[in-house]
Each structure stands twice: as C-alpha cells, then as structure tokens.
Amino acid sequence: MRMSKTLLALGVASALLVGCKKQDDNAAADTATAAAAADANATQTEAPAAKPAVVAFDIDKIPVSDKPLPAWPYIALPAGYHYHEADDLAGQSKDLARVPVWTGGQLLWVEGKTFSDAIRSDDGKTYSKFEVRKNLQQAIEALGGVRIGERSYDEATYKANEKALDDFRQEFDRIRDAYWYDADADTYVIRRADKAVWVVLQTGNGDGGILVAEGPLPDAPAE
C-alpha cells in the first residue's frame, strides 16, 4: 500500500514537471516569436525611402517657336477674367528667382524672370474651370507652347525635395495649389531660340493660379 502511494506521488510529480517544461517551452517560443516580429518591424522601419525615378527632360524634342510674344507676362487671360493684381503686374514679377517645373519625369529648377498671380472672374461672371483651362491652352499653343504635363509630381519626388518645395510654396503662394503632389496642374514650355518660357497653370472650381518663368534653355540629358 505504501509502495502504491509512493508511486502515485512520483507520477504526480513527473506530470507537474512535464507541464512546467511545456509552459517554459511555450513561453520561450512566444518570446522568440515576439523578438522576430520586433526585428522584422525594425527592419521595415529602417528601410530607406524609395528614390523617385527621374526621366531627364529633353528640350530638343520641343520645336523652336519664333512667334511674337505679347508684353510680359506673355499670357493674356480670356474675356471675363483678370489677374488678381491686374493693376500691379510688375509687383507680381521678380527679375530673378528660382522656381521648379515638373516636366512629367523630372523636377527642373529654372532660374530667371518670373511672374505669378491668382486668376479671378470679373464681377457678374461665374468662374469656369473648363473655360479658363481651354482658353489658356489655346493662347499658349498659339505662341508655340507645348503642354508637357497635366499633373504635378508624385509623393516620392515631393519627399525628396520637401524643404525646397515648401520654401517655394511659401514664397509663391498664388500658385501653391499646383505644387501639392498628385495635383491637377498644366505645365507648358515655349521654346525660343535662346531661352525657354515655362507656364504652370492651376485651375480650381472658384479661381486659379499661374506661374510664368523665363530662363535659359535646359541642358540636354547626358547620353
């Protein structure tokens, strides 16, 4: 009888030890799994941001225009619309500034003379995004301009140039809405024999904005 009790006690003790070992093994496995997950998260967090793909702009693909340019800033608005500072166009111009233009594959920085202002409708005239965009497209193309983009840059391009773009948007606030990433914005270039004229147009539902930049012809892309 005493032997049976002893064997029973030993059996219970063995079962308890096995149970404890399983718990320890499970705890160790959980710890290892958590550590692996933490390492994976750390690896994902530390992964560098993807660099934007750059497609160099080739000005030689744009025909040279010799059509006469109107008085600065070259772009006349359609009837029923006016520049916000129509009485002080010179005040909206800078003799030398550095501004970005999105070519559809490259953020190109242009140094030269600039003009920027908001576009408003006259009193009694309802602003039409379609009307402004269509008429300005016709006006710019009549000067030999070519539209090279209808959207702004992507998020990766913005992130790679965030400080410079934010500084620009603060200085040129009339056209800032065209310089969010993935925004509606038309970009045109008028290639002259000795210079390039860039036009960035943003048209919203109630008003718009425009940037005109005149600078040297960009360098040809490296072969």
Predicted segments — roles?
Residues 1-8:
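Bacterial N-terminal signal peptides that target proteins for export
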Residues 9-15:
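Bacterial N-terminal signal peptides
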Residues 17-19:
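C-terminal motif of bacterial Sec signal peptides marking the signal peptidase cleavage site
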